[in-house]
Structures are given as structure tokens and as C-alpha cells.
Amino acid sequence: MPKAIQISEFGGPEVLRLVDVDVGEPEWGAHLADELERIVALHGDTTIAAVIVEPMAGSTAVLPAPKGYLQRLRAICDKYGILLIFDEVITGFGRLGHAFAAERYGVVPDMITFAKGVTSGSVPMGGVIVKSGIHDAFMHGPEHVVEFFHGYTYSAHPLACAAGLAALDLYRDEDLFARAKKLEPLWFDAAMTLKGVPRVLDIRCVGLTAGIDLASRPDGVGKRGYEAMERGFHDQGIMFRIVGDSIAVTPPLIVSESQIGEIFDKVGKVIKALA
């Protein structure tokens, strides 16, 4: 029986929540990537196929990579011949003001996974972009071997492909990636109006995303976040994601300047009304 694939995790930007840092993309933390060196020393570089990372972790309420963190990962992977994979399911297609976060940060990974934004979320679809060397490794194998087996039941589903092509046309025709980049300073300033509001511990913004950490209640973690979600929906008519006692706000790329102000006005009212 083949040896099971093993996955090792090492400390990344999540550690930043344990220290006192500024909002936005942290200046401190690039050295956290050096933990990969320890993993390599422990297991050996020949046992590590790839490193996978989210350039901005959205499901943990917006954790941006510290400045220099992704560049350091790229350098270490190059040093040991390890593939670097960017999970851009959330960050791809304009969320950070570029087609992909790789472009924003100036780091070229070996593979990019994408989904969500490729169809603007209208139909489930995902895909992988690979460097030519990886592509060629599949395509230049023995003739009797399938180059890259991907003909699964829902692969290249016509509905998803049609939605993806339509979304890409709209992104191009309405220049939505550049629009998101232009709106980012306004989005940041609007989010920062919540700084100093009681129960707000930290605010993180990158692209058109914002994460707001709230102080937990003495009677349990997550209860304040849940109340915020309920109040947002029922009292203010706004929907946002909660992760424990953190709020994640990610508007559509067509959001207007006035709507940005309205969003954070409503979020502020929700937070101020919390028990």
C-alpha cells in the first residue's frame, strides 16, 4: 500500500493576532515564513512536494500576508526545489484590485487554484493554472498514458463555462479590477471609521475586504459575533460573514462609493448596539 501523504502546517499570519500590530498589511511578520526552513530541516527537502498558501486568508476573517512574507516563501521554495501553490479561490478575479493576488504582491507561484470569482459566484466552477514546466511534465509523458486525467462528471460543465466566459467579459468590459484598486483607499478609510468603537479590537483591510475583530463576551467566544450577524440582517439589512467574534465584509466589485459609506455606517450601528 502506498505511503500516505503527510501534510505539515507552520505558523503564518494567524500568529499576528497574538501581537500588537497595525491594521492593513502588517509590516511585521515576514520572518514567519522561515518556519518552512525548519520543516525542511526536519523532514528533508526531497520529502516535500509543495507549499500551499492563501495570499490573503479570507475564511479566517481577512488575514493579509505580512509584507515580504510571500516573497520569502518563494525564495525558500526556489532554494529547495519545492513547488509554491497559491490558493486564490477568494483573492482571484479582482478582490484585491488585480486579476490575482500574485500580481499584486509580485510573486509568481508554480500553481494557482481559483474558483468563486471566475463566474462571479453565479455558478460553481473551479480550476488550476500551472507553469509551463508542470504542464509539459504531463504532456510529454509516454504516449499510452493519459496526459492529465481530468474528465470527471462535472469537468468543463457547459453552464459553468458559459457563466465563466460571461463574467470574464464583464470584468474586461467594465474594467472592474482597476475599479476595485481605485476604490481601495476609500474602502480603507471607511473601515477605519470603526477604529475606537467600543468592542472593536482590530481592523484589517486589503483590496475590497475588511476583517473586524470584536472582543469576546465573558460568557463565551462567538456569541458576540453571532449577535452581530443577527442584528446586521434583521436591524440594518446587511449581510456579512462571521468567524467566531470577527466580522468579514467583502462587497461586490460593482459597489459604489456611496454604498461603501453605507456599509460601514450600518456595521458601526450593529457593533454599537451589541451587548
What residue ranges belong to the model's regions?
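Conserved N-terminal phosphate-binding loop of PLP-dependent enzymes in the Aspartate aminotransferase
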Residues: 25-275
